[in-house]
């Protein structure tokens, strides 16, 4: 059986290091960052193993919400739609980008005892902001197909 927590930790660490933006797991990350990601562990599908194999595959879905908030130094400011679109592009590159020459993933996902078999964009609802709100956000959901290594 594949434990979900190590996968979540690995995805958050990868997105943080590759984007140079803080990532909060289900809540705003510590600190006072104006631009950050929220990572949510959503639904998952479990595929039954063949008769000779006791290990199940797992296909979890993770939601990445790119957030751009108001500038604390500027009263009445708001988040920047261009910033969240850049962040969404970066998240897409981190999880789905491939090297054009080799076809290998640009950013490997390393989880002990787990092999990543596939990655895909599950759904991308896009911007979820209210013009009257100072916070701008953009939502994407990624599916990862995992098998025990």
Q: Regions from the language model: what does each represent?
A:
Residues 48, 73-75, 149:
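Intrinsically disordered, low-complexity acidic/polar segments
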Residues 29, 69-83, 124-132:
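Intrinsically disordered, low-complexity coil segments
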Residues 2, 51-55, 78, 82, ...:
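Residues at secondary-structure transition points
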Residues 95-147:
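Acidic-leaning, charged glycine-interspersed low-complexity segments
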Residues 56-74, 91, 134-146:
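Oligomerization/assembly interface segments of phage tail-like spikes and tubes
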Residues 76-103:
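Mid-chain, well-packed structural core segment of small domains
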Residues 1-54, 98-110:
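Small/polar-rich, solvent-exposed N-terminal microdomains that initiate assembly or binding
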């Amino acid at each position: 059986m594949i434990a979900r927590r190590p996968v979540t930790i690995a995805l958050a660490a990868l997105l943080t290091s590759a984007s140079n933006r803080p990532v909060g797991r289900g809540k705003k990350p510590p600190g006072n960052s104006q631009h950050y990601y929220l990572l949510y562990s959503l639904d998952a599908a479990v595929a039954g193993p063949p008769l000779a194999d006791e290990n199940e595959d797992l296909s979890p879905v993770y939601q990445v919400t790119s957030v751009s908030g108001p500038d604390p130094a500027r009263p009445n400011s708001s988040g920047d739609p261009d910033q969240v679109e850049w962040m969404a592009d970066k998240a897409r590159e981190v999880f789905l980008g491939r090297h054009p020459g080799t076809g290998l993933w640009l950013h490997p996902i390393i989880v002990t005892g787990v092999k990543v078999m596939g990655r895909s964009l599950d759904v991308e609802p896009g911007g979820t902001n209210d013009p009257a709100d100072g916070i701008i956000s953009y939502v994407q959901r990624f599916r990862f197909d995992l098998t025990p290594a």
